[in-house]
Amino acid sequence: MDDDAGDGAASGGTKRKVTAASSSAAAKGKAAGKGKAASKASALATAKESSLLKQKSPAEFFAENKNIAGFDNPGKSLYTTMRELVENALDSAESISELPDIEIIIEEITKSKFNTMIGLVDRQRIDEELYDDFESAKAREKRLAKEARFQETQAKNAALGKKVKEAPAARGKGRGEAAFFRVTCKDNGRGMPHDDIPNMLGRVLSGTKYGLRQTRGKFGLGAKMALIWSKMSTGLPIEIKSSMKGQNFISFCRLDIDIHKNVPHVHLHEKRENKDRWHGAELQVIIEGNWTTHRSKILHYMRQMAVITPYAQFLFRFLSDSPDKNLTIQFARRTDVMPPIPLQTKHHPSAVDLLLIKRLISETTKQNLLQFLQHEFVNISKSHAERLIGEMGPDFSAKTTVKSLTSQQLVRIHQLFRQAKFDDPSGNCLSPAGEYNLRLGIIKELHPDLVATHASSPQVFEGHPFIVEAGISIGGKDVKHGLNIFRYANRIPLLFEQGADVITRTALKRINWSSYKINQQQDKIGVFVSIVSTKIPFKGTGKEYIGDDITEIASAVQSALKQCCLQLKSKIVKKLQARERQDRKRNLNRYIPDVARAIMETLGEIADESPPKRPRYDKEDEELLEKVNSEEVTEMTFRDCLTQHVEQVDYEMALEYAMQSGVSEEPREALYLNSLEGSYKFIDFQSPVFVFRFIP
């Protein structure tokens, strides 16, 4: 019985174990089921979320891809902000044919001042180890030891007369503390209509510069991208003052931009009294920046802009928290000759794509195909348009309504445009700086010893006209030895990514400088190339250089530089000849005393000989010997004669040099300097063609 009880107990225990095991398995299965269900639900949620259609506004796109517009980092953002404001100011003044007068101020703002501006109270640190610039005792000891070794090495170098290096600046691990700057740009240009200011500055990809024409801007963003960067880095709005000619009020607007909606957010928009009748615009924005890293780029930009726009006056000021770091530079105006205003032009048939053809059709006011071809494109006359329509096929006629064209017909038009022959577009719509302005700008800023300029005739690349202007200078101030290359596209300086640019590669690899008597390593050579076009073929996302793979542009740049080199070669050769002539004259004058002394000694010995022993001489020789004996002819006499002869030869060579240089062919005009006091004994008889002066 006990055994049976034991067996029963064992059996019951076994059953309980099985039941527990099955319960555990069921629980695990249930948990696994829940896990799978949760995973499936998560996957469905992810799929549903990924299937949602999202949109980004243009402002949001450029905010997330700010490097495209030149806002890679705080330093370059400061440079790009200043550049955009300056170029807008130039465009504004030139649009009303006003000589630009532009003032740029970059003011450094300390962290405490910035916090006060935004109403933020400075807070003392509580947990020092939380901050990136925290330095432990061990790290501090290590740094001080390293600095001591560096100072010891520098002291030894100084004692030995070697170059002493500056101590390296300490670098933090992270971004460090931000630096803020107020950038202000004031001009005397057109100004902006009061009601248009919010949309002109607070809505990305809206403006007045869109169309087929030569423009300074690369993206059409201008100050709008500076406002986006301000929104991202400081959160502060932009302030605008503007007034147009004839207005008795100044428009004041304080606004920022709604990044997600791409619409302006206006804080204040009002009219103020304009007592001085000022016209133009003044923009002020506060951004994060870095003056230290991009100081040289900003100053180089201003100097190069002063070269290409000598008709403009720039006043640049940097205001630091430390007065000893303040900087003021004025780039004075040198001429009042301004380039013509760029004209908007029509598209060349060979430069359009299918999408552009569709847009032109949707915007045209012309009804039939003949009128559309004749009026919406350049270089298509009526007869040419009729020939093109006849070539398109039986489905086309001169009276075909352009709005009714099918997609297949549009493709046919596009294909014919790519295959047909058209005259090249003219460069009348372009606005180059001009040789005169380029030369004046180079002379004004560099003060070179020699300068040559050349402007090419209009040429074409992919249906877009372009003009290349070049200048080369030798010598000058603040110019390094070797090649100093200054690049311009649509009259704005290009400072970044120089190595891959067509201008740089042409100057370095395609010009044999030595054949033009120019020493590429030792001479101070300034190479200036400006390319203007309705479409600059920039490379890279930042549009900082023009590619070297465009044969038409590379050939035009090389030709323009060679023309400048040829001009310089003739000048250099003439200078070398003049220098050789001066050296020859100096060397001859150096030997005159010795030659005169030798001649005098020889003649003295001959004169001392008795007549029977002396050879028979001509009468003139005998007279000379007698003068030597009587000391009527001395060593100084021969010196004077030789000096006079050298002067005569030098004069004849200089006259021949002048005649070869064409100086004698230039018109000459007599100039008279008369005292304001006193009377003169002559009479002038005036005639339309001459003045006859009678001097008694």
UniProtKB/Swiss-Prot annotation:
Where does this one sit in the cell? Nucleus
Residue ranges, annotated region (Disordered): 1-36
Where composition is biased (Low complexity), the residues are 20-36
Instruction: Cite the CDD domains for this sequence.
Output: TopoIIB_Trans (cd00823)
Tell me which EC number(s) this protein carries.
Answer: 5.6.2.2
Cysteine-cysteine disulfides: none
Q: Which SUPFAM superfamilies match?
A: ATPase domain of HSP90 chaperone/DNA topoisomerase II/histidine kinase, Ribosomal protein S5 domain 2-like
Stored InterPro entries: HATPase_C_sf (IPR036890), Ribosomal_Su5_D2-typ_SF (IPR020568), Ribsml_uS5_D2-typ_fold_subgr (IPR014721), TopoVI_B (IPR005734), TopoVI_B_transducer (IPR015320)
Q: Name one GO biological process term.
A: DNA topological change
Q: What induces it?
A: By auxin, abscisic acid (ABA) and benzylaminopurine.
Q: Which Gene3D superfamilies match?
A: 1.10.8.50, 3.30.230.10, Histidine kinase-like ATPase, C-terminal domain
Q: Which GO terms describe its molecular function?
A: ATP binding; DNA binding; DNA topoisomerase type II (double strand cut, ATP-hydrolyzing) activity; identical protein binding
Nucleotide-binding as a keyword of this entry, yes or no, is yes
Q: In which tissues is it expressed?
A: Highly expressed in flowers before pollination. Expressed in roots and shoots.
Which positions does UniProt annotate for ATP binding? 88, 187, 208-209, 217-224, 543
Recorded superkingdom: Eukaryota
The entry's keywords: ATP-binding, DNA-binding, Isomerase, Nucleotide-binding, Nucleus, Topoisomerase
One GO term of the cellular component aspect?
A: DNA topoisomerase type II (double strand cut, ATP-hydrolyzing) complex
Q: Which reaction does it catalyse?
A: ATP-dependent breakage, passage and rejoining of double-stranded DNA
Entries under Pfam families matching the protein: HATPase_c_3, Topo-VIb_trans
Self-association state and partner proteins as the record states: Homodimer. Heterotetramer of two TOP6A and two TOP6B subunits. Interacts with SPO11-2 and TOP6A3.
Q: Which family does the similarity line name?
A: Belongs to the TOP6B family.
| Job description of the protein | Component of the DNA topoisomerase VI involved in chromatin organization and progression of endoreduplication cycles. Relaxes both positive and negative superturns and exhibits a strong decatenase activity. The B subunit binds ATP. May be involved in cell proliferation and stress tolerance.
The protein's name: DNA topoisomerase 6 subunit B
Quote the gene name from the UniProt entry: TOP6B
